[in-house]
Structures are given as C-alpha cells and as structure tokens.
Amino acid sequence: MTWIPLYLFLLLFVLINFGKKAWPWIIFLILTVTFTDQVSSHVLKPLVNRPRPCHDVLLADHIRLLLGYCSDSRSFTSSHAANHFGVGIFIFCTLKTYFKNWSYLFLLWAATVSYGQIYIGVHYPLDVLGGALLGSTIGYLMALFINKRFPFDSPNIPPVKD
C-alpha cells in the first residue's frame, strides 16, 4: 500500500495539467491494471499452478518469510510485478515527452516492487520476470492504442525537447 501516494499524486498531476484529455488516459491506466491483474491472477496462476517458495517443502527451512504469512494463491506470475510494470511502461510510453529521463523512475519503481516480492520470500525470480514481461506487454499495447487514438498534449507543460 506504500505505492498509493505515488499513484494519487500522478493522477492529480495528470488531471491538473491535462484537463479533460486526462480522462481517457486515466481510464486506460485503470484498464491496464485490470488486464494485467486478471490475466496474471485468473489465467496464468491457475494454468501454471506453481506453489509459492514459502509453501515448497524443500525450501521451507531456507526461506525467510518477512511478512509472517504466505498467501495460498499460486506463484507464477507475480501480480505485483505484472501490475507495476504495466503501469510503469504505460506511464513511460505516454508521458515520456513531458518527463523525459524522469520517466525511467516509474520503471525503477516497478523493478523495486518486483524485487521486493523475491526478497520477502513470496515469489521465485522467474515469477517476477514472467509478471514483468506480462505487465510490460500489456502496458505497451495500451500505451500504443491511447497514443494513436487520444493524442496527449498539455496546455500547461511544454514537451521536453531532445
């Protein structure tokens, strides 16, 4: 839940600077998270049916579970990685003309959240990589669509020139 202030700030930033043009962007951002989460949680996890490392009997003595509990849901793919990479790639591809190199911070954020899933012992590295690839693909496709269908420009912020 520590990510909520960042995303609330981003939504306010977009609403203030892009006005009515922000609404398609916000809707597609929400759709991006919805698609990444649903495909990860309701398609891939049941299909692959891989247990989390914290439920693996062979690894139980070697896992340090920092949360104190281990979810009963399946492990592949990491929905956290899918969701955050979906959002990160979507933001990067739609707002990079305004944020330029600062756009990379959203990818760093997604990578940090994803690494955290391995660090706390609830995902294998390939779970996170699979989630990152899923999220990146969906985020990129959603950004392609919105960039073509709803061109994004702000009367308040000039695009950064290369």
Model-derived regions: residue spans:
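The first (N-terminal) embedded transmembrane alpha-helix
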Residues: 1-9
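Membrane-embedded glycan transfer/ligation machinery
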Residues: 4-5, 41, 82-85
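Interfacial segments of alpha-helical transmembrane regions
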Residues: 11-39
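Membrane-embedded catalytic cores of phosphoryl/pyrophosphoryl-handling enzymes
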Residues: 18, 64-162
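Short hydrophobic alpha-helical module
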Residues: 32, 46, 50, 91-94, ...
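Transmembrane alpha-helix/helix-exit interface in multi-pass inner-membrane proteins
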Residues: 34-54
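Interfacial juxtamembrane loops and adjacent helix segments
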Residues: 53-67
